[in-house]
């Protein structure tokens, strides 16, 4: 099973809590994390893009770096690990993304990939006059399909003459063009999975629950059903937060403290911003992110326990049919990656030989 790290491009990582570690994003921090991940055999690093945060006492995600420029820097200071940036497709034309991908591929040949996101938080785009209107919630995958088509043509052939509703290319050219840039999509709704099966190479989905490592299995089944219709092979990667310590009790005490210290003002903002998109269906990523059960960490699957038990649960994840890998976040990234590499990974049968 492959292992990736979802690096903290925004302040405080993925814990919306006054009790969690409070820190600002920086190139130095992410360089330390990714170089450490490479040292311990991680397969890839991914950064998100966030253009407006949730506020609150912790100013959650009000401070963010930009994904492509950050990953270009990290590409230059690593040797093996794959590097994935996220394109906010409402802000970056596909031809510009293709040219940036060509540049980063020159820095790190064969190691770069692109995560495509449609955008769900209106405030991110409205602030700069780029929000297309409420119809975006229903039209977004039509838009993204055209975007991905243009991007694929430019990445694979260096030229596009695509003519569609949203994009019109006229002998648009990108050279040099990389030969094998992977595309990623994180949609988990039926519509999102259908898009992924048609246009992407990798699917990212949220794990579910606390210490329920196999609860996500249904999304793999739905992805396979969608991919069977397109005849394409799409790999499934699942997102989990790791909160580990020497004992189950110590790890659970941290998790309970994070939950007790939840930044309620920031969570209220998340709920408000997510509501229009969540209304599109219970299986959307946004509906899960904002669900009240564990919004403190955006409701991603959470594995809490001793190093031994976290290793065991990750092996259970690996055993779910269709799982190619996991994407990990940590409550404390520097210590978390170190402890994963030295205390968790050596106990995992699914990482034997790494």
From Swiss-Prot:
Its EC number is 1.14.99.46. SUPFAM superfamilies: Bacterial luciferase-like (SSF51679). GO terms for biological process: alkanesulfonate catabolic process; nitrogen utilization; uracil catabolic process. The keyword Transmembrane does not apply. Keywords: Flavoprotein, FMN, Monooxygenase, NADP, Oxidoreductase. Pfam families: Bac_luciferase. It comes from the Bacteria. It is an enzyme of class 1 (oxidoreductase). FMN binds at residues 49-50, 115, 124, 140-141, 189. InterPro entries: Luciferase-like_dom, Luciferase-like_sf, Pyrimidine_monooxygenase_RutA, SsuD_RutA_monooxygenase. It catalyses: uracil + FMNH2 + NADH + O2 = (Z)-3-ureidoacrylate + FMN + NAD(+) + H2O + H(+); thymine + FMNH2 + NADH + O2 = (Z)-2-methylureidoacrylate + FMN + NAD(+) + H2O + H(+). HAMAP family: RutA. Belongs to the NtaA/SnaA/DszA monooxygenase family. RutA subfamily. PANTHER family: ALKANESULFONATE MONOOXYGENASE, ALKANESULFONATE MONOOXYGENASE-RELATED. This is Pyrimidine monooxygenase RutA. It comes from Caulobacter sp. (strain K31).
């Amino acid at each position: 099973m492959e292992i990736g790290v979802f690096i903290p491009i925004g302040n405080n990582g993925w814990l919306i809590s006054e009790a969690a570690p409070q820190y600002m994003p920086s190139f130095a921090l992410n360089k330390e994390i990714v170089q450490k991940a490479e040292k311990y055999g991680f397969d890839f690093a991914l950064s998100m893009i966030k253009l407006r945060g949730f506020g609150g006492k912790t100013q959650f995600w009000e401070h963010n770096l930009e994904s492509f420029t950050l990953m270009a820097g990290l590409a230059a200071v690593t040797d093996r690990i794959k590097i994935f940036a996220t394109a906010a497709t409402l802000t970056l034309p596909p031809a510009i993304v293709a040219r940036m991908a060509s540049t980063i591929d020159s820095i790190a040949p064969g190691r770069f990939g692109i995560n495509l996101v449609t955008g769900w938080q209106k405030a991110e785009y409205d602030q700069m006059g780029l929000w297309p209107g409420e119809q975006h919630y229903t039209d977004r995958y039509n838009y993204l399909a055209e975007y991905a088509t243009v991007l694929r043509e430019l990445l694979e052939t260096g030229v596009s003459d695509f003519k569609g509703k949203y994009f019109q290319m006229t002998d648009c050219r990108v050279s040099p063009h990389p030969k094998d840039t992977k595309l990623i999509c994180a949609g988990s709704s039926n519509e999102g999975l259908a898009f992924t099966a048609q246009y992407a190479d990798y699917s990212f989905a949220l794990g579910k629950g606390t210490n329920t490592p196999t609860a996500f299995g249904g999304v793999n089944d739905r992805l396979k059903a969608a991919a069977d219709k397109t005849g394409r092979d799409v790999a499934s990667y699942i997102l989990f937060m790791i909160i580990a310590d020497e004992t189950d009790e110590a790890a659970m005490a941290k998790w309970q403290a994070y939950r007790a210290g939840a930044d309620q003002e920031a969570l209220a903002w998340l709920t408000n911003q997510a509501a229009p998109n969540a209304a599109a269906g219970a299986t959307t990523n946004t509906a899960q992110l904002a669900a009240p059960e564990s919004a403190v960490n955006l409701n991603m699957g959470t594995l809490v326990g001793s190093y031994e038990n976290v290793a065991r649960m990750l092996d259970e994840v690996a055993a779910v049919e269709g799982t190619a890998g996991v994407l990990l976040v940590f409550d404390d990234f520097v210590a978390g990656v170190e402890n994963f590499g030295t205390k968790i990974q050596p106990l995992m049968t699914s990482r034997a030989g790494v």
